[in-house]
Every structure is written in structure tokens, then in C-alpha cells.
Swiss-Prot record:
GO biological process, alphabetically ordered: AMP salvage
Organism: Chromobacterium violaceum (strain ATCC 12472 / DSM 30191 / JCM 1249 / CCUG 213 / NBRC 12614 / NCIMB 9131 / NCTC 9757 / MK)
EC number in record: 2.7.4.3
Subunit-level organization: Monomer.
Catalysed reaction, written as an equation: AMP + ATP = 2 ADP
Keyword Transferase: yes
Designated gene of the protein: adk
Region (LID): 122-159
Domain of life: Bacteria
Binding site for AMP: 31, 36, 57-59, 85-88, 92, 156, 167
Binding site for ATP: 10-15, 123, 132-133, 203
Protein family according to the UniProt entry: Belongs to the adenylate kinase family.
Segments for region (NMP): 30-59
Protein name (database record): Adenylate kinase
EC supergroup of this enzyme: transferase
């Protein structure tokens, strides 16, 4: 099972990725984790990536693809893998195909922007304990206060509406185009084309999970 999970920040990809990992016994691979592991291991690609990052640059696609090929050759990928947050752009997707990295499924968790803003901007956190609330979906007993300690809840900077909207804008500009790319690839009928699956992510987590696993033949 080799798949790519797509979806905007806040669409619930992380939760669904955990279900998929557990069901199929495959690792979840993110470019950030790959880069950190390669830098730590001191591999040639890792050292090259570190030099670029230390200079404040963006790691080139050819290095990323090289790291991907190294990573998926490891033993824990024998049954497949789940790419989270990769590829981010069409050039990366094309480079992956050119490098012979085959994918079985592309799964998009689809949630409208307005629903994501409501989800994320409504989050409140008790920093000391990590307890999380939502002003609409999981409100504290007393507005703005932690249920256990009575201490103030805060809104993380990442959850502020303007920040969420900026992240969504970046997603639509860079990554959402992949949805169209993989959709067309699936329609092309090419033997190498992955199956493209779009799942409504606005429903209960368990319902989304069941639909995802069903689409993957589980």
C-alpha cells in the first residue's frame, strides 16, 4: 500500500494517517522527518541539505527525491508507505514519477475553507496541561477557563483566524493544484497512474476513517 495523503491544514490528515498506518502496518513519511533523519545520519544527501538549510535556502527537489528513494528502500517500507505533505508541488510529483516512485492511491481529505477556519480558530488550549477545547464543538464549562484548574485558556498563534487563512492561501496556491494533477493522471488510464480518491472530511472522524479504509480496500 503506497499512498499520498492530501488535504488542507486542519482537514484532519494527521488523524486519518494514524488509522491508515495502523491498518496497513506502513510508516508515515514526511519530508521534515526525512530531512532531519538524513542530517542526523550524516548521509551525503543529508549533509548537502543541511548546508542549504543552514544558509536559509529551500532544499532542491532533486535532493528531496533522492531522500525519498533512500527512505522507501528501507525495511519498514516493505509493505508500502504513506507520504504526508509530499509531494507539495507538481514539479515534485513529476520528478517522483520520473524517478520511478510508484504510488497506488492518492487520497484527498476534502474540507471547505470556512469549515477549517471554524475548526481551527475555535480551538482553545490550557497550556500547562495541554487540554484542548473548542468554543463550539467542545466548550469548557466556564467560557475561557480550564475545566480542571479554572485557569485561563489561550488561543495559539497558529489557530488565529488570520494565520489559518494565510496557511490555506499557501495550500491553495502550491498544493491544491496536485489534486487536479493526480485527478487527470488517474483519468488517463496509464498503468502507472494511482487511483484518486476524494473523501468528505466534514463528517465525524470515524465516518471519514471508515470511508478512507473502504476506498483503500480494507
Amino acid at each position: 500500500m503506497r499512498l499520498i495523503l492530501l488535504g488542507a491544514p486542519g482537514a484532519g490528515k494527521g488523524t486519518q494517517a494514524n488509522y491508515i498506518r495502523e491498518k496497513f502496518g506502513i510508516p508515515q513519511i514526511s519530508t521534515g522527518d526525512m530531512l532531519r533523519a538524513a542530517v542526523k545520519a550524516g548521509t551525503p544527501l543529508g549533509l548537502e541539505a543541511k548546508a542549504i538549510m543552514d544558509a536559509g535556502g529551500l532544499v532542491r527537489d532533486d535532493i528531496i527525491i533522492g531522500l525519498v528513494k533512500e527512505r522507501i528502500a528501507q525495511d519498514d517500507c516493505a509493505n508500502g508507505f504513506l507520504f504526508d505533505g509530499f509531494p507539495r508541488t507538481i514539479p515534485q510529483a513529476e520528478a517522483m514519477i520520473a524517478a520511478g516512485v510508484d504510488i497506488d492511491y492518492v487520497v484527498e481529505i476534502d474540507v471547505p475553507d470556512a469549515a477549517i477556519v471554524e475548526r481551527m480558530a475555535g480551538r482553545r488550549v490550557h497550556l500547562a496541561s495541554g487540554r484542548t477545547y473548542h468554543v463550539t464543538f467542545n466548550p469548557p464549562k466556564a467560557a475561557g477557563k480550564d475545566d480542571v484548574t479554572g485557569e485561563d485558556l489561550v488561543q495559539r498563534d497558529d489557530d488565529k483566524e488570520e494565520t489559518v487563512k494565510k496557511r490555506l492561501a499557501v495550500y491553495h496556491e502550491q498544493t491544491a493544484v496536485l489534486v487536479g494533477f493526480y485527478g487527470k493522471l488517474a483519468e488517463s488510464g496509464s498503468a502507472k497512474a494511482p487511483k484518486y480518491v476524494k473523501i468528505d472530511g466534514t463528517r465525524a472522524v470515524e465516518t471519514v476513517r471508515d470511508d478512507v479504509l473502504k476506498a483503500l480496500g480494507a
